C-alpha cells in the first residue's frame, strides 16, 4: 500500500486487500453510511468486478433507532448499492434500548443481526470497515483499562463471532486514505455526530489522539 495516507486506493490494491476471500461463497458487508464502510462497499464491488468468479456480495445496514438521520442514511446506502449492482438490506434494532452502555449494546445487536443475515444467505464472512485508526484507538482503550498481553493484541484481521467469520480487510489502512478514495470517486458519505460525542469513551480518546 502507498506510504501517502492521502493517496486513493487503486483497483489492484483493492484486489490485494480482499484476496483472502476470493473463494468465499458469499459475503455480507456491514455498511453504516460513514466513510469507512462506504469505502469498504465501493472497494469490494470493484474487487468483485475484477474477478472472473467470486463471492456473492450482500450489503447490510443496521439502523439502531438511536438517531433520526439513520433511516435517511440507510436509504442513501441502498441507492449506492443499487448503483454498484449489489443487493442491500436494512435491519432495525427493535425493542427497548438500555440507558447505559449503549455503544456496547448496539454493537452486540448489530453483530447478532448481521450474523443472522449471513447464515440465512449462506455467507461465511461478514466484512467490517475497521481501519488502522480504529486499531490504534482499540489498543489505547485496552491499555487504559489495564488489559493484559492478550488484550493488547487488539483486533485480528479475521475472528469468529456469532457462528460466522468477521473479516477486517481495511485494518492496515488509515481513514484518510479511504476518504481520499471516496473523494476521487465523488462518492458522498454520512457524518455520524456520535463519533465525536465525548460522552463516550472512544470519541474521547479519538479527540486526544488527534
Regions found by a protein language model. Name each.
Residues 2-208:
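Core alpha/beta nucleotide-donor-binding catalytic domains of modification enzymes
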Amino acid at each position: 500500500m502507498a506510504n501517502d495516507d492521502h493517496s486513493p486506493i487503486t483497483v489492484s490494491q483493492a484486489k490485494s486487500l480482499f484476496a483472502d476471500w476470493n473463494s468465499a461463497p458469499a459475503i455480507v458487508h456491514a455498511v453504516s453510511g460513514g466513510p469507512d464502510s462506504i469505502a469498504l462497499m465501493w472497494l469490494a464491488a470493484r474487487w468483485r468486478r475484477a474477478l472472473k468468479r467470486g463471492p456473492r456480495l450482500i450489503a447490510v445496514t443496521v439502523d439502531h433507532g438511536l438517531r433520526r438521520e439513520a433511516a435517511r442514511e440507510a436509504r442513501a446506502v441502498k441507492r449506492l448499492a443499487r448503483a454498484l449492482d449489489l443487493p442491500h438490506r436494512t435491519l432495525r434494532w427493535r425493542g427497548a434500548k438500555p440507558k447505559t452502555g449503549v455503544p456496547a449494546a448496539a454493537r452486540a445487536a448489530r453483530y447478532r443481526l448481521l450474523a443472522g443475515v449471513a447464515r440465512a444467505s449462506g455467507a461465511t464472512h461478514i466484512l467490517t470497515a475497521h481501519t488502522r485508526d480504529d486499531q490504534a484507538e482499540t489498543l489505547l482503550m485496552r491499555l487504559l483499562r489495564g488489559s493484559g498481553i492478550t488484550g493488547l493484541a487488539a483486533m485480528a484481521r479475521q475472528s469468529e463471532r456469532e457462528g460466522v467469520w468477521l473479516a477486517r480487510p481495511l485494518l492496515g489502512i488509515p481513514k484518510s486514505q479511504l476518504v481520499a478514495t471516496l473523494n476521487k470517486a465523488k462518492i458522498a458519505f454520512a457524518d455520524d455526530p456520535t463519533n465525536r460525542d465525548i460522552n463516550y469513551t472512544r470519541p474521547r480518546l479519538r479527540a486526544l489522539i488527534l
